[in-house]
Swiss-Prot record:
InterPro entries according to UniProt: DnaJ, DnaJ_C, DnaJ_domain, DnaJ_domain_CS, HSP40/DnaJ_pept-bd, HSP_DnaJ_Cys-rich_dom, HSP_DnaJ_Cys-rich_dom_sf, J_dom_sf
Top-level taxonomic group: Bacteria
UniProt keyword annotation of Mitochondrion present: no
List of residues binding Zn(2+) 2: 162, 165, 188, 191
Listed name of the protein: Chaperone protein DnaJ
Molecular functions (GO terms): ATP binding; heat shock protein binding; unfolded protein binding; zinc ion binding
Function: Participates actively in the response to hyperosmotic and heat shock by preventing the aggregation of stress-denatured proteins and by disaggregating proteins, also in an autonomous, DnaK-independent fashion. Unfolded proteins bind initially to DnaJ; upon interaction with the DnaJ-bound protein, DnaK hydrolyzes its bound ATP, resulting in the formation of a stable complex. GrpE releases ADP from DnaK; ATP binding to DnaK triggers the release of the substrate protein, thus completing the reaction cycle.
The keyword Signal is assigned to this record: no
Any one annotated GO CC term: cytoplasm
Organism whose genome encodes this protein: Peanut witches'-broom phytoplasma
Amino acid sequence: MKQKKDYYEVLELSRDAKLDDIKKAYRRLSKKYHPDVCKEANADAKFKEVQEAFDVLSNTNKRAQYDQMGHNFNNQGFNSDFQGFQSANFEEFEDLFSSFFGRRKSNRHQEDIKGEDHHIKLTISFMESVLGTQKTVTFNVKENCEKCDGTGAKTKNDIRICNVCKGNGYISYTQQGWFVSVFGKQICPECGGNKKIYFRPECKFCKGVGMVKSEHKVTLNIPAGVESGMRLKSPNQGHQGPSGAPNGDLYVDINVQPHKTFQRKGNDIFSSILINFYQAALGTIINVDTIHGNVQLKIPAGTQTDTKFRLKNKGVPYVNSPFSIGDHYVIVKIYTPQNLSNTQKKLFEQLEELEELNRKSKTNSSWF
């Protein structure tokens, strides 16, 4: 019986390789030896060998057993194998085939081959993020060349049916796992999903690519409550799909500018107000700015610095749930006056004397 090749040698890795290195090697070699791409006679065997090596080395438990026992370790355990397959391999199948064609084309949930998705970054103000807004963005997308109808050929006589996908625009694949087989369709690497290929001369407008860049303008509805790091999706606003397939989607990464007064934590707003010592001692009513407008806040007598007051439902709406709103918290800061006049100093001295008398009175009364 033929001795199995060392799994590290199969993936062309050292024995201290990191998981990211293992994944990169798997994608590279799987792409290289995939039967639909590689024409070598033993491509199928090498492809399975790469898959087997990855299945073991990408799983922490299996790898540890393999490092100790080599090919003698038991690779048939149900619990660990099934869990490892779901957490790593199944996702890697999708990543593998997306790497073949430069973009994700998995159709486990749909049969159509879509155009590429487009990603942009959008910076908005703090108030726009908490209240919602509309933004018009302009960007370039790839569309079928009108001159050659997306074929890339100079004339229709230069076009032939693709002999790889037989005019289907996609190729089928079957990926064997330990307990499941993955079936799917991927865009044809030969014709790029156009179902046809051309022979020179090429279209002079698109240089044989079949697609040209076109300026695209979209008005986006930004919901109230978004924050930095959120990604919004605008369906069918990405690059045009091949041969009439749906467009890709537009993904918008949100960046929110900071506000000079308000700070946001989750869906709550925090701000500070400055009052003087006699307002804190006697109590007062002050006006407070919120994202929803100006409101009055009652400051009770004897308020101390850093006291926090809650304004219910004056915070940020939850995204896609406008009836759920956070709160606004107001933190009080007490101002100590400087550069006192002689009159003010005398008044403070009188207050100090009264405070001292009051303290002594309380001390004496405690003896009875």
